[in-house]
Amino acid sequence: MMRAVYGGIADQMIRLAEKKQLKDRELWKLVTKQFAETPDDADHGWRGEYWGKLMRGACMTWQYTRDQELYGILTESVKELLTCQEADGRISTYSRQEEFQGWDIWCRKYVLLGLIHFHEICAEAELSKQVLEAAERHLDAIIERIGEGEGKKRITLASDAGKGINSSSILEPVVRLYMISPRRQYLEFADYIVENGGAEGFDIFQAAFEDRLYPYEYPVVKAYELMSCFEGLLFYAQVKKEEHWRQAVIRFADRLLESESVIVGGSGCRHELFNHSSLMQTGTEYDGRMLETCVTVTWMKLLSR
């Protein structure tokens, strides 16, 4: 594996984040603790996203620093998370009575991403096997309840936020897990997500391919979640070898470069939404929130692929 070694501010900031956040054992305990309880029942929130986000970033950081203390902390956290997995593979911050609403699948997406990223760096054969099996069982529990057929819920109806694009964004780790563990049901589930169009009542993937609209003209303009769906579509296009969907991602990104890039590097100048930011960045109206950091990071990740 090739590694880049930076100097100056890039290296300093990576090591600062590692020292101050990623080596904070109390923080890891806090984000893992959420899965031993059901805190998101109260408001259908997204407390379950933090473990996976933190794990993904920490694994990427470890690939740069190769810090053994950090690796040990990540190993401890993964083992703790696995104790929260239920008999059927489910890992969630929602109870069974409240599951598959709000941000439940979104949170489970990040659990899956966190497990996949740790699996990539895991040096212990037995733990690596356990982590992969946990990821498989976690996804299997979702596929059992989401999709077509009696007793299943359509993925775009598994959330009342943003026409379900937050749920559809699980496409990325579904495909990534298929690339590690090529089970037919994982690719079929990815097919299902794409065929459903990402959003309830609107096919974001086909709209991007047809290239008639800017993303701020879509009926759903939540920037972070939209881009996350297209990250997944790019992995899907790679696995399926479908130029149609690769072009859809390229056209989507080109439209964003034209209409949403701002001088400070983010996008989405109205709340956390696409709003023709390239133009509106000079506006004088401010609703108290703009240029969500998650949007900036996801934009960087999408372009890096």
Locate predicted features.
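Glycan-recognition and catalytic cores of secretory/periplasmic carbohydrate-active enzymes
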Residues: 1-305
